[in-house]
Design a protein with these regions (language model features):
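Membrane/wall-proximal cationic-aromatic binding patches
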Residues: 3-30
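Short, conserved loop/helix-junction motifs that constitute active-site signature segments
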Residues: 21-23, 87-88, 137-140
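Conserved SGNH/GDSL esterase-like catalytic core that processes O-acyl groups on lipids
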Residues: 24-29, 35-119
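Short hydrophobic segments within beta-strands
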Residues: 31-32, 147
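Alpha-helical structural signal in soluble globular domains
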Residues: 49-53, 135, 139, 160-168
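Cysteine protease catalytic core and zymogen-processing segment of caspase-like enzymes
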Residues: 117-129
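Generic structural signal for well-ordered alpha-helices
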Residues: 129-133, 158
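Extracellular serine-dependent O-acyl
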Residues: 143-148, 154-181
Length: 181
């Protein structure tokens, strides 16, 4: 709480909106773990800033310490299936590439050529990624965007980012990972 970046001046309600933002009026969905949650910033993350600065509405489904891989009821997949309204109208689905999968040594898996949900091995990182992409695309019919974490010195996470960029070309999604290369 006493971190300088958590000062009142930086709270979303104290940030000026962007005039004529192309995001104005959009409804965004954020799925992730601690970064999306805002764990070190009083539960306020970039999602709140994007919404306030750009006159957006949003849904934020974020729980710290969780994984993409479907290994328990708090996984990204389970929370996406059970906590996000499948009838919602989203303009974009934005998902965090979790470092927790790398930290927990979740198997990377293989990229599939399928677009059938039942074909993905969701116990692996890549199977979970592909499941999330296909489910979001077929449920909300909106662009699917992934973002990577800050610099994280992990060979396993580096491989996850590399594979995400391969999936990006196959699945026609957007991955914001180039910043850290």
């Amino acid at each position: 709480k006493s971190l300088p970046g958590n000062a009142e001046i930086y709270r979303p309600e104290n940030v000026a909106p962007v005039e004529n933002s192309p995001l104005s009026g959009m409804n965004l969905c954020f799925l992730g773990s601690s970064v999306t949650e805002g764990a070190a910033s009083l539960e306020t993350s970039f999602a709140e800033y994007i919404a306030v600065r750009n006159n957006c509405t949003y849904v934020k489904e974020a729980v710290g310490g969780t994984t993409l891989a479907d290994n328990d009821k708090t996984s990204y997949i389970q929370r996406m299936l059970h906590n996000i309204d499948p009838n919602a109208q989203f303009d974009a689905f934005i998902c965090q590439l979790s470092t927790n999968d790398a930290s927990n040594a979740i198997p990377l898996g293989e990229i599939s050529s399928s677009r059938n949900l039942e074909d993905f091995d969701t116990k692996t990182v890549l199977g979970a990624l592909e499941y999330i992409i296909v489910y979001a695309d077929t449920t909300w019919h909106c662009p699917v965007v992934f973002y990577t974490g800050t610099q994280y010195d992990s060979p396993a996470y580096g491989k996850m980012v590399e594979q995400l960029l391969k999936i990006e070309n196959i699945a026609k999604i957007n991955a914001f990972a180039e910043v850290f290369r």
